[in-house]
From Swiss-Prot:
Subcellular location, principal: cytoplasm
Pathway membership: Purine metabolism; IMP biosynthesis via de novo pathway; 5-amino-1-(5-phospho-D-ribosyl)imidazole from N(2)-formyl-N(1)-(5-phospho-D-ribosyl)glycinamide: step 2/2
Keyword Nucleotide-binding set for record: yes
Gene3D superfamilies in the cross-refs: PurM-like C-terminal domain, PurM-like, N-terminal domain
GO terms (BP aspect): 'de novo' IMP biosynthetic process; adenine biosynthetic process
A single Gene Ontology CC term: cytosol
Known catalytic reactions: 2-formamido-N(1)-(5-O-phospho-beta-D-ribosyl)acetamidine + ATP = 5-amino-1-(5-phospho-beta-D-ribosyl)imidazole + ADP + phosphate + H(+)
One term of GO molecular function: ATP binding
Principal EC category: ligase
Descriptive protein name: Phosphoribosylformylglycinamidine cyclo-ligase
Family: Belongs to the AIR synthase family.
Amino acid sequence: MTSGKNGLTYADAGVDIDAGNELVDRIKPAAKRTNRPGVMSGLGGFGALFDLKAAGYEDPILVGATDGVGTKLRIAIDTGLVDGVGIDLVAMCVNDLVCQGAEPLFFLDYFATGKLETDVAARIIEGIAEGCVRSGCALIGGETAEMPGMYPKGDFDLAGFAVGAMERGTALPAGVSEGDVLLGLASDGVHSNGYSLVRQIVKYSGLGWDGDNPFGEGKLGEALLTPTRLYVKQSLAAVRAGGVNALAHITGGGLTENLPRVLPDDLGADIDLGAWELPGVFKWMAQTGGIEESEMLKTFNCGIGMILVVKADRADALTEVLEGEGETVARLGTVTRGEGIRYTGALL
């Protein structure tokens, strides 16, 4: 064993333990704000504990989901506007959970970077905590990995992990039938999918992230970083009201690829593309990039972030429930015999 004043340290290798500890201290209040019934431990342990009985479950089935934010992070890194990507991370996971009929219970995050910048990391994790508060789940743990040589200066990556539960026998999808009505919930923009194409379109346009937004107010970068909408509380309110047979989170693959994931093999859907107004961001991208309608529909959410498949005789009542929760609801079409999605009308 060697010793001496000139011996190497972990800090010499580029890992700042003190910065990591400072980050934990800074984010503890944000994590504490997410506490809910069932949480049994705080940050800092080797594992996090959650009591399903204390959360009100008698015979629960657990559901897990994991996701990231994709290349939307590139825009956040380049602009320094990182506060919303934590909400994106939570939304991408918990919106998937509710498609199984599950209530999100807890969330864990993974933040990786080459050099830990405490303020940047704290802003991101505070965004994660905000997403957890809005969706009713607890931020009970996470990992901050400082890995010198693995990422260019200023770059980072994120991953999220969510666990939810529902009582046995209540899992979705269930009972989807021909004639069911499709209720679409409006998106808040591009959300967190298709950003490799988004970035190509912006490059082709010649605009910068700090340029004026060509489809609305503010700057282009700010507009494209609008956080993914959280559909948890409103979707679960509809499920509890009765008559919801399935939910589809419209992410990568757009309407064309995601809705069939919750339909039986022998059923498809007819969707009227005139049932909702295409948001300006999608009009601008289609026009600027010369993107065909079919490509838009299998890449982006095109203004519909979640679809509920509901019994026809419950469609009106569930529309009222969703609108009462603050949602903009469009009646998109119906479930039909035969595979695939058939579109009528025009998107563009």
